[in-house]
Amino acid sequence: MIRELDRKPMNLLVLGASGGCGQWLVRLARERGHHIRALVRPATPFNPSAGIEVIRGEVLEEGVLDRALEGCETVLSALGIQRKTPWNPWSALASPPDLATQAARRLVETMPGHGVRRVVAISAGGVGESVRQLHPLLRWLIAHSNVAASYRDLEGMEAVFAGSGLDWLAVRPTTLRAGPPTGTIQVVQHFGLFSHISRCDVAAWMLAAAERPEPFTERTPMIGTTGRRRRKSAWSAKRP
């Protein structure tokens, strides 16, 4: 971990800045002294604090990433497929079914021209080979709902980055929750029914990764919080 006094401000581009994890990325990066540029869709409400540069545009549109990447050092991506009713796994998709994959292709094509080599993206626990680490009921839910579309897209995103030659990392969080930071984040080997992590903790982990000077070696770590939530509080938790 980089010491507070040793950390130098970076120029960061945040994709998906208006979403749950994206808003935390912007907020925490600003608190840590970084310079943030947020790419946000034209019609999406987004009112960040002072000092955040906002570019309006669609990530898949020609020329948008060229504008957004100018002068940046690292990309933080919180992009992913959205469902019309986020808490309902069977809800219809509200995003293109290959949003993250297509955005990754655009990044791979565009980043080298701007001298940007590092990207840290959000994937999901259970993507790719980590499906073996999922509880059987979670595997069933993913396979028999529209969550499967998100997982196919994120697997495609990871594959694009894997063949890019970039310094990339795709973090695979367990179930995302609302809530304050815990600071008890760890790489986990099992994704159970009650495994969870707050969006704030995911954002903090991504920023810490982006600040490391050494190249990434572990490309797709699965992360969660330490300890287990009691069964009663797990069922009574608010929907994310």
Sequence positions of predicted segments:
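Substrate-positioning beta->alpha
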Residues: 99-100, 153, 171, 197-208, ...
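Conserved beta-loop-beta element that borders a ligand/cofactor-binding pocket
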Residues: 158-180
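Core catalytic loop region at the nicotinamide-binding pocket of NAD(P)H-dependent oxidoreductases
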Residues: 209-233
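NAD(P)H-binding glycine-rich loop region in Rossmannoid oxidoreductase-like domains
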Residues: 5, 44-102, 106, 110-113, ...
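Conserved SDR Rossmann-fold cofactor-binding beta-strand/turn motif
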Residues: 40, 123, 172-175
